[in-house]
Amino acid sequence: SYFTILLGKMAFYIVLCMLQFFIMLAAGALLMPILGLDSLQIGHAYGALFLTVLVVAATATAYGVLIGSVFQTPNQALPFGAISIVILSAIGGIWVPVEILPAGLQQLAKLSPLHWALDAINELFLRTGTILTVWKQLIILLFFALIFFLIAGITESRRRR
């Protein structure tokens, strides 16, 4: 089925996303001190960090697959993808901390998967969180990933008929 093909494509990109993340971590931990800056402190919950990165990568990849399924050409998909990520990042608290926004916008932030990803990463890096403190964010991100994946699969299946 097409869902199997989508899963195969997603597996590759999830691994790629995770590699990118861990390369950036290594740069923060190893390269920053060489430049005279403080080393990145990644906390102590390595398993929780790995699982969080896996779930965030799966959600991001599922969103990319959804965009690729909805649009028929890269020229259609690329602008939408870029603009939608900028909007979701603004809504989700990437630009401005959600805590300083009005109550209504704080609720709106919860509609962005980027909000939940940032919250999980901040919990692990800044608040020395564990899997017990990020499980809610990971479940919500998995829900987003599942919805994106199902819509992509249904869209592509209908297109192939």
Which residue stretches match the model-derived regions?
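Alpha-helical transmembrane segments and their short interhelical loops
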Residues: 2, 6-79, 86, 132-136, ...
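Small-residue-rich segments of transmembrane alpha-helices in multi-pass membrane proteins
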Residues: 85-91
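Membrane-interfacial helix-loop-helix junctions in multi-pass membrane proteins
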Residues: 93-147
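Short secondary-structure boundary segments
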Residues: 129, 153-154
